[in-house]
Design a protein with these regions (language model features):
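Short aromatic-hydrophobic micro-motifs that form the base-stacking/packing surface
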Residues: 78-82
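N-terminal glycine-rich phosphate-binding loop and ensuing alpha1 helix
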Residues: 1-35
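Hydrophobic packing residues within well-ordered alpha-helices of enzyme cores
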Residues: 36-40, 97
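Hydrophobic C-terminal alpha-helix "anchor/cap" residues
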Residues: 12-16, 40, 69
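Conserved core of the sugar-phosphate nucleotidyltransferase
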Residues: 88-181
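Short phosphate-binding loop-to-helix
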Residues: 41-77
Length: 198
């Protein structure tokens, strides 16, 4: 909890309060489904329409979520896939992701790569470096048309791709281009207790 609210509620409030967002689906552990519905009721998250069980990895879980949306929404509708542990996503980030998805067909939230990036084979010594002006750090949300992302997941399964780490990497693995929308250094992923202090 942060400020007496579960982190996921902070995240959901960003989408709840965005005028372009009509509905939310949350993918979670089966044991958390009822808890999440109770949280949504307690904190007045009225746009939460679907809560579905996750799969054995991230790709599975995203697939479960987008397939649920496919049952209820138009294939041309836009879905933004977002990490629950990125509660500091701004309205501007959400809006730009939607705008680029409308314009280009998909949108991956990114920020510039400010650090020097080293290449290694053994984790001990460098074998080279990457030019950081040609690198982007990906964040979420990542935007797609519902029909496109569902078809991508079906094609990936047929191709034997079952454990891609993110929707953007799945797109690349399937030979497709991704387009960039504007992220922020503040849109961090909370992965340690220290992150919460920020």
């Amino acid at each position: 909890h942060v400020e007496n609210k579960p982190i996921i509620i902070h995240t959901m409030e960003a989408f709840q309060n965005h005028p372009s967002v009509d509905a939310m689906v949350v993918v979670t552990l089966p044991a958390w489904i009822d808890v999440l519905k109770a949280y949504a009721a307690q904190f007045n998250i009225t746009k939460l329409k679907y809560v579905v069980p996750g799969g054995k990895n991230g790709q599975d879980s995203i697939r479960n979520g987008v397939y649920e949306l496919e049952k209820h929404h138009d294939p041309e509708d836009i879905v933004l896939i977002h990490d629950a542990i990125r509660p500091m996503v701004s309205a501007e980030i959400i809006s730009d992701c939607i705008r680029i998805t409308q314009k280009c067909g998909n949108a991956i939230t990114v920020i510039p790569c400010a650090e020097a990036m080293m290449q290694t084979e053994d984790g001990v010594v460098s074998i080279g470096s990457y030019p950081r002006d040609k690198l982007k750090r990906t964040q979420t949300p990542q935007g797609f048309h519902i029909g496109d992302i569902c078809e991508l997941h079906r094609e990936a399964l047929k191709a034997g791709i079952t454990n891609s780490v993110a929707s953007c990497t799945l797109m690349i693995e399937m030979g497709k281009q991704v387009y960039f929308s504007a992220g922020s250094e503040k849109n961090i992923k909370l992965t340690t207790i220290e992150d919460i202090d920020i």
